[in-house]
Amino acid sequence: MKVRLKSKKKMKKPALNPERRKFLKEATRTAGGLAGVGILLGLQQNQSLAREGVPLRPPFALQDAKAFSAACIRCGQCVQACPYDMLHLASLLSPVEAGTPYFIARDKPCEMCPDIPCAKACPSGALDRQATDINESRMGLSVLLDHETCLNYQGLRCDVCYRVCPLIDKAITLETQHNPRSDKHALFIPTVHSDACTGCGKCEQACVLEEAAIKILPMDLAKGMLGKHYRLGWEEKAKAGHSLAPKDMISLPTRTPEGTTVIPEPAEPVLAPILGSGK
């Protein structure tokens, strides 16, 4: 005897509300985005803890950061041309714009190649291809930041930064000072001269301290710039061959060591002759 079972009708799933579907889709997308941001921030935090140093540009790079970033086409040819593997191509997590070349002096300084292959390989003008003298490059400026830990400031003869300088006695010299601790010895203080320092980074890389007391900083951080509105009187006098200010034109009170103040009489006004007046 055959028994025929009745088939159960399939239950239809209720249709998902379009608004609810849209909400779940947006929520999933937002959660994924936040997770990605968290990963990136974590990587950047780990990178910052690494304290890899100040990023510097290759020799003869355009000094203006915006101009360099605009001129660099991120081709990496300068990095490939460096025979010492000193240059790096920046990634998304690097301290400079992705795809641009940089180096960390504490890790690997510039070896000052006489033929400047990195600059010669640049096709865009971000690096000066016409440069011929590597000693004229200005990758940064050496600055002795920490006098409290520098061994020479403690009265010890370290002199390593001075000895490794490619332009010894020009870019870095040793200046003597009295040692107040012993009262009978001299301190030999490393002194950087900005007119000769190339910013190669050999001094920073060679510093014997765990954290270098001398560092290479970008020029805009290391050196103040005199505003265009300033005029140095002695320079203007040398250019003109005479003083540009009439004698006794400016009269300021004179304060004597005794504490008295002498106020000079006002000078006669000086009128410049009017051109074409014949006077």
From Swiss-Prot:
[4Fe-4S] cluster 2 binds at C110, C113, C118, C122. Binds 4 [4Fe-4S] cluster. [4Fe-4S] cluster 1 binds at C72, C75, C78, C82. Predicted to be exported by the Tat system. The position of the signal peptide cleavage has not been experimentally proven. Pfam families: Fer4_7. [4Fe-4S] cluster 3 binds at C150, C158, C161, C165. Its cofactor is [4Fe-4S] cluster. Its main location: periplasm. [4Fe-4S] cluster 4 binds at C197, C200, C203, C207. GO terms for molecular function: 4 iron, 4 sulfur cluster binding; metal ion binding. Residues 63-92, 100-132, 141-177, 188-219 form the 4Fe-4S ferredoxin-type domain. It is found in: Periplasm. One of its GO terms (cellular component) is periplasmic space. Keywords: 4Fe-4S, Electron transport, Iron, Iron-sulfur, Metal-binding, Periplasm, Repeat, Signal, Transport. Residues 1-50 form the signal peptide. Required for electron transfer from ubiquinol, via NapC, to the periplasmic nitrate reductase NapAB complex. This is Ferredoxin-type protein NapG. It comes from Haemophilus influenzae (strain ATCC 51907 / DSM 11121 / KW20 / Rd).
